[in-house]
């Protein structure tokens, strides 16, 4: 074989190994300095992944020693979600450059801060959402539902935590994990409110479902993508260990700027056997934002939910677009709050748990799989939403009560 042919084959082999990419978003807002999410290629074995993490840790420590730095940082979270593998942590740019050179790495993404998708809170006021989703026509305050009410389904509230001792949960709620830091409690109230809509005895839809608190956002309602992916990772592993895959739902009433890693992790969790309802997000009414520009609302296979008003219109704050699968009540929703209390909130945060709750109820009553739930809800949904937004469905959530 000629030297020219050998050289050609050599360089062809080199080019066949695609270099890892550092995803650098044009919008730099909410980026956490020196914090990264590293995602492996799909063909990397678990054993090779473990070896890679040991190598990356050694590189990190060597760079610190070379710089004479006393900083710690390094690897923080490890992700294994239905074959999707990655990790996150605080690393110097020199370490990230070495990681990008590794053939097992698919891409590296800067970590970002994340926020809730609720807007306003007003304590102790009446609600309307339950009556609306159980009747074809507006204006009925009675909630009509199948008595199985989510029995046998496990709900994962990926949020600010849940007041697991709230009387409306009747002992069905347990604490799961905390990736946000702080106390193992809901110091904000958002997570308890969304959980109450999903599975509260008085304020909820799937009144017999189990609840698991997955705290990924702080008392101030903020967090990081890396911690949210870890919450998803923990939930999948918990569901697998407790034989709940295929019989589980998750609500994600949170959002932030577009993230490839968050979208992939959320999609893998859905495909692993958890039905996931995601808030479409809220923006200033003058912005008119497309949910395709946010995560995890733009993730594949999940059920993205926009917010409707009491008059069956699109809420002025609600994101819209082709990613939206369905609308659900999202203004002035009363539900549980910490300390055995109740309160009123508005936002796509309040719409998504209606879908998670009906999803749990439909899974229990019809025996369908998580992958079938969203299409089923769209199938039975009501064509009621006025001004839904350009290229957006006009379907409103309905629990198929027959009323």
From Swiss-Prot:
Subcellular location: Secreted
Residues of the Inhibitor I9 domain: 35-116
EC numbers on record: 3.4.21.-
Listed SUPFAM superfamilies: Protease propeptides/inhibitors, Subtilisin-like
Domain of life assignment: Eukaryota
Positions of glycan attachment: 233, 251, 399
Propeptide: 20-117
Transmembrane segments: none
Entry GO MF terms: serine-type endopeptidase activity
Family membership: Belongs to the peptidase S8 family.
Protein's name according to its UniProt entry: Subtilisin-like protease CPC735_035780
Organism, scientific name: Coccidioides posadasii (strain C735)
Lineage: Eukaryota, Fungi, Dikarya, Ascomycota, Pezizomycotina
């Amino acid at each position: 074989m000629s030297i020219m042919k050998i050289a050609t084959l050599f360089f062809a082999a080199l080019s066949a190994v695609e270099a890892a990419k550092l995803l650098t978003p044009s919008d730099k807002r909410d980026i956490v300095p020196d914090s990264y999410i590293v995602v492996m290629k799909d063909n990397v074995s678990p054993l090779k992944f473990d070896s890679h993490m040991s190598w990356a840790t050694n590189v990190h420590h060597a760079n610190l020693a070379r710089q004479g730095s006393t900083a710690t940082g390094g690897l923080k979270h490890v992700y294994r979600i239905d074959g999707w593998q990655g990790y996150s942590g605080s690393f110097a740019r020199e370490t990230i450059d070495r990681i990008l050179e590794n053939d097992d790495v698919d891409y590296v993404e800067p970590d970002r801060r994340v926020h809730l998708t609720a807007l306003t809170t007003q304590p102790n006021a009446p609600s309307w959402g339950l009556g609306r989703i159980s009747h074809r026509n507006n204006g009925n305050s009675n909630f009509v539902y199948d008595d199985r009410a989510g029995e046998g389904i496990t709900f994962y509230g990926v949020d600010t935590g849940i007041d697991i001792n709230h009387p409306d949960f009747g002992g069905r709620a347990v604490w799961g994990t905390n990736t946000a830091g702080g106390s193992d409690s809901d110091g904000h109230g958002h997570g308890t409110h969304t959980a109450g809509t999903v599975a509260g005895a008085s304020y909820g839809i799937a009144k017999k479902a189990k609840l698991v608190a997955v705290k990924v956002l702080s008392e101030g309602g903020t967090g990081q993508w890396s911690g949210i992916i870890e919450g998803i990772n923990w939930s999948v592993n918990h569901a697998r260990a407790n034989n709940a895959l295929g019989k589980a739902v998750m609500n994600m009433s949170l959002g932030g700027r577009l993230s490839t890693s968050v979208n992939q992790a959320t999609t893998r969790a859905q495909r692993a056997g958890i039905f996931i309802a995601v808030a479409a997000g809220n923006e200033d009414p003058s912005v008119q934002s497309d949910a395709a520009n946010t995560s995890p609302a733009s993730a594949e296979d999940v059920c993205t939910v926009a917010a409707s008003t009491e008059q069956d219109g699109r809420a002025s704050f609600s994101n819209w677009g082709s990613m939206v699968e369905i609308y659900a009540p999202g203004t002035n929703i009363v539900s549980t709050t910490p300390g055995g209390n109740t309160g009123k909130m508005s936002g796509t945060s309040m719409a998504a748990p209606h879908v998670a709750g009906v999803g749990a109820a439909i899974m229990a009553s019809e025996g369908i799989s998580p992958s079938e739930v969203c299409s089923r809800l769209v199938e039975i949904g009501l064509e009621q939403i006025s001004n839904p937004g350009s290229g957006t469905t006009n379907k409103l959530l309905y629990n198929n009560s027959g009323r």
